UniProtKB/Swiss-Prot annotation:
The chain crosses the membrane at residues 3-23, 69-89, 94-114. Keywords: Glycoprotein, Host membrane, Membrane, Transmembrane, Transmembrane helix. Disulfide bonds: none annotated. It comes from African swine fever virus (isolate Warthog/Namibia/Wart80/1980) (ASFV). Its main location: host cell. The lineage of its organism: Viruses, Varidnaviria, Bamfordvirae, Nucleocytoviricota, Pokkesviricetes. Glycans are attached at N62. It is a multi-pass membrane protein. Plays a role in virus cell tropism, and may be required for efficient virus replication in macrophages. This is Protein MGF 110-11L.
């Protein structure tokens, strides 16, 4: 668990899905934490950006939902990893571990409609 958290904190690049629609191209906006003022944008159909004015355009009405889903899945990935680490530390049986994972999975499925509101 400590190794996983260390790798997560040590990873210096954040990729944010900026915009995705069937009618338009998809783009990833990359921010490097090691190099100050380093920004790059990678698109499915690359085009030249002369200024950083395009950075304002990636906020649309779905951005809050994207952040909610990202945080939700981040929290539940920690919960799944914690469940497996707990099972290993306590020497639980495989049946008990699977029951815990099933309960977490059911909780994830039941909380999906709440995220869409």
């Amino acid at each position: 668990m400590k190794v996983f958290l260390g790798l997560l904190l040590g990873y210096s690049t954040i990729l944010i899905l900026t915009y995705q629609s069937p009618a338009t191209q998809w783009c990833f906006y990359e921010i490097s934490l090691k190099i100050p003022n380093h920004h790059s944008m990678e698109c499915s159909y690359p085009r030249l950006y002369k200024h950083f004015m395009f950075m304002k355009k990636w906020r649309d009405k779905n951005w809050s939902i994207i952040i909610r889903y990202y945080c939700f899945y981040l929290v539940f990935s920690f919960a799944f990893a914690g469940c497996i680490a707990f099972a290993i530390c306590k020497n639980l049986r495989l049946c008990t571990t699977m029951k815990l994972l099933m309960l977490l999975s059911i909780l994830v499925l039941l909380s999906q409609p709440i995220l869409n509101n």
